[in-house]
From Swiss-Prot:
The modification N6-(pyridoxal phosphate)lysine is found at K119. Heme binds at C52, H65. Its cofactor is pyridoxal 5'-phosphate. It comes from Oryctolagus cuniculus. SUPFAM superfamilies: CBS-domain pair, Tryptophan synthase beta subunit-like PLP-dependent enzymes. This is Cystathionine beta-synthase.
Length: 551
């Protein structure tokens, strides 16, 4: 995969995508937007324009990168890193038939990699390329902003090779990923899920700050590192071609950093030019083309490892023939289907890919073949989409789909509860005063609203006290600095059963009421106001007091 010759002082593995932090001004965003007085911030954006010079038809001999041929594995592997790659291709039998496909539907099962995901390939490739370039040396520290799977791959390789590993990941990522990372010896830093990628508080921003503070540390940077798509160009794509004897008519892959679909697609365009490349992007992400596909009211999504709010440098959208958007609901439904009907223990993003595959492959005929990439394992999501409770709480599963006998109160509405007048706090109130107010009123939490009543977030005693003790805030700081935004909302018309599912995982739920607001000639807008805060104790009190009347 040809690329410009690396320049002196460039990033890991001599990658032409990576101009060093002291290099091109185009890669530097030294101060947060609109704040010229802020301290200088040194980082490299994950969406800088690509400098890769790969062209269809250009000889691989012109490439500055090292390309190794696929090798047969020995009977006894020298270490677990040799079990990365050579993943099986499995025929999907029932799902394709049930959705009326005429073509053959095959799954490339990347969860058979040593660390459980397709990201093991790029993790090992980035490290080995950096070692060959002399960038990464014994005793150095690897830092990486990641949704979890790349982190697991890097932590696995770091454990075997002896590097210190620090993984920076958003809060929405599953606890299972965190537990696996800790078991592998990685240090973990969590960042707010809703932080924009270019914010200093994002997983990207925090990783670059740590790099400035820790000597001999490196961000291999999957978003810009040419080793990312190269891993798939040299191995994943070659395996697919060998397993299919060079015959495939469509490839479907979801996109996160874009390295998987870019690397595979470039090789297939060279060796199997008639193969259609189908990209999968979740609703709420902006990777798909044309841009109209990305227009949605969805601002967040639960499926992990795919989609972004920026276009990563390594994503080459010119090699994708068509994009499809996927929803959380269909992603998790298809992931469960793959497990239940095909015995494939895959993750949610695999469900996204297969949901799109059964749509895109409708045009294929008998004798044609569609290959879909299943990126990771269900291991990382045992407490998420594998759980009926989680699926019900998120609205991805209906009560009617579960044949379980429910208690007498299950279908009653939240409005049946005796909710007290809500206590709210303005964002300018200090942490010290807020603690006094909550303790004085006997509350553990309160909504933070602005002057118009719009909900900004929640503040909890536990969150405030831990932030104060950790030195993140001072007692005199405004409470808006410790807003808690990972809370659940429920409406008065929702059932107590739905509330029960929330309270099994959370200490409270915010009861909200929707209003339609008109502002003169402007279009009406929906806004939410606080009706109350409900806790498990409120529900238990209601059940106990009304239960006697039911007997």
């Amino acid at each position: 995969m040809p690329s410009e010759t690396a320049q002196a002082g460039e990033g890991p593995a001599g990658c032409p995508h990576l101009s060093g932090a002291q290099g091109s001004d185009r890669s530097l965003d030294q101060r947060p937007p609109g704040n010229k007085d802020a301290p200088e911030r040194v980082w490299i954006r994950p969406d800088v324009p690509s400098r890769c010079t790969w062209e269809l038809g250009r000889p691989v001999a012109d490439s500055p990168h090292q390309h190794a041929a696929l090798a047969k594995s020995p009977k006894i592997l020298p270490d677990i890193l040799q079990k990365i790659g050579d993943t099986p291709m499995v025929r999907i039998n029932k799902i394709g038939k049930n959705f009326g496909l005429k073509c053959e539907l095959l799954a490339k099962c990347e969860f058979f990699n040593a660390g459980g995901s397709v990201k093991d390939r790029i993790s090992l490739r980035m490290i080995e390329d950096a070692e060959r370039a002399g960038t990464l040396r014994p005793g150095d520290t690897i830092i990486e902003p990641t949704s979890g799977n790349t982190g697991i791959g890097l932590a696995l390789a770091a454990a075997v090779k002896g590097y210190r590993c620090i993984i920076v990941m958003p809060e929405k990522m599953s606890l299972e990923k965190v537990d696996v990372l800790r078991a592998l010896g990685a240090e973990i830093v969590r960042t707010p899920t809703n932080a924009r990628f270019d914010s200093p508080e994002s997983h990207v921003g925090v990783a670059w700050r740590l790099k400035q503070e820790i000597p001999n540390s490196h961000i291999l940077d999957q978003y810009r590192n040419a080793s990312n798509p190269l891993a798939h160009y040299d191995t994943t794509a070659e395996e697919i071609l060998q397993q299919c004897d060079g015959k495939l008519d469509m490839l479907v892959a979801s996109a996160g950093t874009g390295g998987t679909i870019t690397g595979i697609a470039r090789k297939l365009k060279e060796k199997c030019p008639g193969c259609q490349i189908i990209g999968v992007d979740p609703e709420g992400s902006i990777l798909a083309e044309p841009e109209e596909l990305n227009q949605t009211e969805v601002t967040a999504y639960e499926v992990e490892g795919i989609g972004y709010d920026f276009i990563p440098t390594v994503l080459d959208r010119t090699v994708v023939d068509r994009w499809f958007k996927s929803t959380d609901k269909e992603a998790f439904a298809f992931a469960r289907m793959l497990i239940a009907q095909e015995g494939l223990l895959c993750g949610g993003s695999a469900g996204s890919a297969v949901a799109v595959a059964v749509k895109a492959a409708q045009e294929l005929q008998e004798g044609q073949r569609c290959v879909v990439i299943l990126p990771d394992s269900v291991r990382n999501y045992m407490s998420k989409f594998l759980s009926d409770r989680w699926m019900l709480q998120k609205g991805f599963l209906e009560e009617e789909e579960l044949s379980v006998k429910r208690p007498w109160w299950w279908h009653l509405r939240v409005q049946e509860l005796s909710l007290s007048v809500p206590l709210t706090v303005l964002p300018g109130v200090t942490c010290s005063d807020t603690i006094d107010i909550l303790r004085g009123k006997g509350f553990d939490q309160a909504p933070v609203v602005d002057e118009t009543g719009e909900i900004l977030g929640m503040v909890t005693l536990g969150n405030m006290l831990s932030s104060l003790l950790a030195g993140k805030v001072q007692p005199s700081d405004q409470v808006c600095k410790v807003l808690y935004k990972q809370f659940k909302q429920i409406r008065l018309t929702d059932t107590l059963g739905a509330l029960s599912h929330i309270l099994e995982m959370d200490h409270f739920a915010l009861v909200v009421h929707e209003q339609i607001q008109y502002g003169g000639d402007e279009q009406p807008s929906k806004r939410q106001t606080v009706f109350g805060v409900v806790t498990a104790m409120d529900l238990l009190h209601f059940v106990a007091s009304r239960g006697q009347d039911q007997q």
